[in-house]
Amino acid sequence: HFTSCCPGWVRNMEINFASAIPHVSTTKSPIQMGGALGKTWAAKHVWNKDPRDVCIVSITPCTAKIFEASRPEFIDAWKWNVEHNVIPKDSPVFPDIDYSLTTRDIAEVFRRLGIDPLKMPTTHEVKPTEKYTGAGTIFGCSGGVMEAALRTAYALLAGEELKNPDIISVRGLNNSLVEATVPIPLKAQGGKIFELRVAVV
């Protein structure tokens, strides 16, 4: 299967490789999932707000995610809230992501408003929606999705975390194809080594 977290890659598949679409993961990008979660679970359990009053703004590394946020099919939070009687069935349709800015856009906003991120407070109460993992941090890097998936697969199959979580061999900044073999000791089979072969394109 091909991952689907990059909307530019997904659009490329839709336009140029339509026959391969059945092999693309049906999972939305993390930003789109976050938008839907914000207007369902977080609206109720974190902010105690009507989901129609929640505005989700994504700050993204690329313009493809702005395009993704504008796709009319991404109204899952609205559908869920209607189906579960959280909002009336005749409520106007709303998107999972209301606004999307690139990191360059937000830097320009900061510049115009005279905000210096380096001079902002560094500590505050951490909210449930602000917690993240190392795998989540590398997700947006080239090869990061694969590295995050490998870390998780290793932990699940071996029953322990990788001693060195950096899997440099799947990072592909300068190559169009990167292949790697990751040996995993299978806990359920007494430590028998399973070689997981992966590729990043």
Feature map (PLM): residue ranges:
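Iron-sulfur-associated redox domains of electron-transfer enzymes in respiratory
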Residues: 1-201
